[in-house]
Swiss-Prot record:
Residues the entry annotates as binding Zn(2+): 269, 333
Disulphide bridges, residue numbers: none
Top class in the EC scheme: lyase
Residues binding [4Fe-4S] cluster: 408, 411, 415
Chain's gene name: thiC
Domain of life: Bacteria
Protein name: Phosphomethylpyrimidine synthase
Task performed by this protein: Catalyzes the synthesis of the hydroxymethylpyrimidine phosphate (HMP-P) moiety of thiamine from aminoimidazole ribotide (AIR) in a radical S-adenosyl-L-methionine (SAM)-dependent reaction.
Keyword hit for Iron: yes
Signal peptide: none
Length: 431
């Protein structure tokens, strides 16, 4: 019985109780959210010792870290190292996006070495194996694709990105649209390429009920991928993107009817003035399903700093109602990320998530900032470091130019707070 089915029977599962405790909310709230489909708990029934994570309405904004090999770089060991860094930096979930050699070994090692929910894009495995077996990715069969999905579900994968909304009709809309960057989603490109080669409908759409059967058996959460997400801000919110979203809205309803948990993925590259509209559109079309966004990146001209462009967009998106941020690293658009890139990406997205949680009124979010203000007024450095989002980095930065007095090295003897306390009689009790 899936979490969704139990919630509809008003059964509060241990997982729902755990999420309620983490979020500081009543278990009944979590149960109702799962039943309504606006909260998901990605948790394959075969996973053991899983650190549960609730994603959706009324909960804190979550952050995902992508890792994985490419055809040119990456090993099992390198990806496990990135995994550990992502965990240390505070990621809530992990996705393995491997496309390189030993693709199965990488995924299995990640599963073995993490207690965080793990997501994948199964078409990557199917494409890699088809290239090895048949000489070309497009020669994979529908059975190959569903076999990859089922084998990963049996291993314990908690959520899968599937590009079900890339239909023949949507492809026609895309062709008529005219884009600067065409299709930038690998999964979307694999799917569209297969459809054109075979002159056939997307098997994930045509056989969506089969996909639901697999997910229901293992309680795998569906993450409906946006294969036609915009790859530059000039392509944002175009007809192709919206056409796919309309299909995803229909599939959300079918997944819920099948008692399968489902969330929806979103753009992408979006200028600041279009982000809120994108969130509102998705929430309306997809009936308040949890929204999982990549960034969004708000400008295209900052390679090497796209963790910042993604954090800017992520903060605006989450404040407007997005529930789940996929991190962006400084290596985006340039290379495979290394361990340092992973850390910086997670931290940047966590800052965005927290900033949005203050706006959302998430339990404890604003209070943490209030406590930081009090600690700063007191020049209480231990408390400031403990309250900081990245205590290790904060301590290293402070220790670079440590002064003799209580103030930091920026102001020294001219610390505004210390002078106000001394000469104006302004005490910390006013904070």
């Amino acid at each position: 019985m899936t979490q969704l089915k139990q919630a509809r029977k008003n059964i509060i599962t241990p997982g729902m109780k755990a999420i309620a405790k983490i979020e500081g909310l009543p278990p009944e709230f979590i149960c109702q959210g799962v039943a309504d489909g606006n909260i998901v708990i990605p948790a394959n029934k075969l996973r053991k010792n899983l650190k549960l994570c609730g994603i959706g309405k009324g909960l804190s904004t979550k952050v995902n870290a992508n890792i994985g090999t490419s055809t040119d770089f990456g090993t099992v060991e390198s990806e496990v190292e990135k995994l550990k860094m992502a965990e240390m930096a505070g990621a809530d979930t992990i996705m393995d996006l491997s496309t390189g050699p030993k693709i199965n070994s990488v995924r299995q090692s990640i599963l073995k070495n993490t207690c965080l929910p793990l997501g994948t894009v199964p078409v990557y495995q199917a494409a890699v194996e088809a290239k090895d077996r048949y000489g070309a990715m497009v020669k994979m069969t529908a059975d190959d694709l569903f076999s990859a999905i089922e084998s990963q579900a049996k291993e314990g994968v908690d959520f899968v990105t599937v590009h079900c909304g890339v239909t023949r009709q949507v492809i026609d809309t895309f062709k008529g649209q005219g884009r600067l960057t065409d299709i930038v989603s690998r999964g979307g490109t694999f799917t569209a390429g297969w459809m054109v080669f075979h002159q056939a409908e997307n098997p994930l759409y045509e056989h969506f009920d089969h996909l639901l059967d697999i997910c229901r058996e293992y309680d795998v959460t569906l993450s409906l991928g946006d294969g036609l997400r915009p790859g530059c801000i000039a392509d944002a919110t175009d007809r192709a993107q919206v056409a796919e979203l309309l299909v995803l809205g229909e599939l959300v309803k079918r997944a819920r009817e099948a008692e399968v948990q489902v969330m929806v993925e979103g753009p992408g590259h979006v200028p600041l003035n279009q982000i809120e509209a994108n969130i509102r559109l998705q929430k309306s079309v997809c009936e308040d399903a949890p929204f999982y966004v990549l960034g969004p990146l708000v400008t295209d001209i900052a390679p090497g700093y796209d963790h910042i462009t993604g954090a800017i967009g992520g903060a605006v998106a989450a404040a407007a109602g997005a529930d789940f941020l996929c991190y962006v690293t400084p290596a985006e658009h340039l290379s495979l990320p290394d361990v340092t890139d992973v850390r910086n990406g997670v931290i940047a997205s966590r800052i965005a998530a927290h900033a949005a949680d203050i706006v959302k009124g998430v339990n404890g979010a604003a209070e943490r900032d209030r406590q930081m203000a009090i600690a700063r007024k007191k020049l209480d450095w231990d408390s400031q470091l403990n309250l900081s989002l990245d205590p290790e980095h904060a301590k290293l930065t402070r220790d670079r130019f440590k002064t003799k007095g209580k103030a930091c090295s920026m102001c020294g003897d001219f610390c505004a707070m210390e002078l106000a306390e001394k000469h104006l009689g302004v005490s910390v009790s006013r904070c």
